[in-house]
């Protein structure tokens, strides 16, 4: 990979993170209304995902340009995990007060969910520490065995366990909230947290794919399994969002319904990464360099929809939160474009 292109792909996640923080701060300073509180806090929290994606980009690009660096393989996942833990603590702090307001309740749950995603993405960074083994293993055969440089089976299973456990936590928590969906804050927080949990579940497939390909244990059975898994979760999340929008006339349905649809777009962006790794595993795919266009389209979908919603929010404040949050989700999708491009450069056969 060209060193200048490498730096561009490293900078994209940081720039997108700064945009989320800047827009979130601007929204918070604009008004003290509850809609501004929720949108501003959620936007700022999305920077944690961008930070985690930056650590992933840095680790892989460094290997492509300079080879494996043990120090980077340790430092950058720690940075990503630190950002995710801080985000989860921030979300929990909003929920820990004695008299939690509705806006704090919703924002706290969403921010905690964003922190969970950041932790899963940081696990992608941690599992990518020996990314160069993937094209090497793909050029060989399963009979070659596990390379001595690869993670042990125990470490690999521990890495996969991180998104699995966070997915279970998010699913149980969101279902608990939805059991009292007659309470509006529970209804909103439960649906959005369930969508965030779907993203964590998608990242199970990505981490498992990277770990198994690195260890040369990527089986024929799971070759397309994770692709189906991620596309299924993305589609279910989009359908859930549509259901929320059409199942009621209450304005409270607008934010979770619209945001769920765009969380599905993030799932599709993750699908592009899982699909790419599956396509180039022990085969040649002439269209592999087109796959990075998927997160570009999902990014544009989020941003264009946000622009329409911003106009609608002038007359109906129910559209205000999604019109702002979707900008941050679009930034995350564009950050995923840089990651998919890096994976394509590192793993596709030219």
Curated annotation (Swiss-Prot):
Stretches in topological domain Cytoplasmic: 1-2, 63-74, 126-157, 212-225, 279-290, 346-350
This protein's record includes keyword Cell membrane: yes
Keyword Thylakoid among record annotations: no
Highest taxon, organism lineage: Bacteria
Membrane association type: Multi-pass membrane protein
One Gene Ontology term from the biological process aspect of the record: cellular response to acidic pH
Predominant location: membrane
Transmembrane intervals: 3-23, 42-62, 75-95, 105-125, 158-178, 191-211, 226-246, 258-278, 291-311, 325-345
Signal peptide limits: none
Pfam families per record: DUF2776
Periplasmic topological domain residue ranges: 24-41, 96-104, 179-190, 247-257, 312-324
Subcellular location: Cell inner membrane
Keywords associated with the record: Cell inner membrane, Cell membrane, Membrane, Transmembrane, Transmembrane helix
Cellular component, GO annotation: plasma membrane
Protein name (Swiss-Prot/TrEMBL): Inner membrane protein YhiM
Organism expressing this protein natively: Escherichia coli (strain K12)
Upper classification of the organism: Bacteria, Pseudomonadati, Pseudomonadota, Gammaproteobacteria, Enterobacterales
